[in-house]
Amino acid sequence: MVSCFDFFLSLNFGKMAKRFVWRTDKPQADLPQTPNSQVRIVSRDLPRGGNY
């Protein structure tokens, strides 16, 4: 019974992880369409590039 419960939990976690990845991937794909987010990406990446 415990193994069935663990299997169910792992299935639920897989679904949640898939949904989370899909949620995070979609906005990133939509980002270049809006100029504001593009500027934000550049400003966010500049310090990282300076550190390297």
UniProtKB/Swiss-Prot annotation:
Composition skew (Basic and acidic residues), residue ranges: 42-52
Disulfide-bonded cysteines: none
UniProt feature, compositional bias: Polar residues: 31-40
Source organism per UniProt: Glycine max
Tissue specificity of this protein: Expressed in roots. Barely detected in flowers.
Region of interest (Disordered), ranges: 27-52
Keywords noted in UniProt: Plant defense
GO biological process: one example: defense response
Protein name, per record: Protein PROPEP890
Keyword Transit peptide: no
Induction remark: Up-regulated by the GmPep890 peptide and methyl salicylate. No induction by methyl jasmonate.
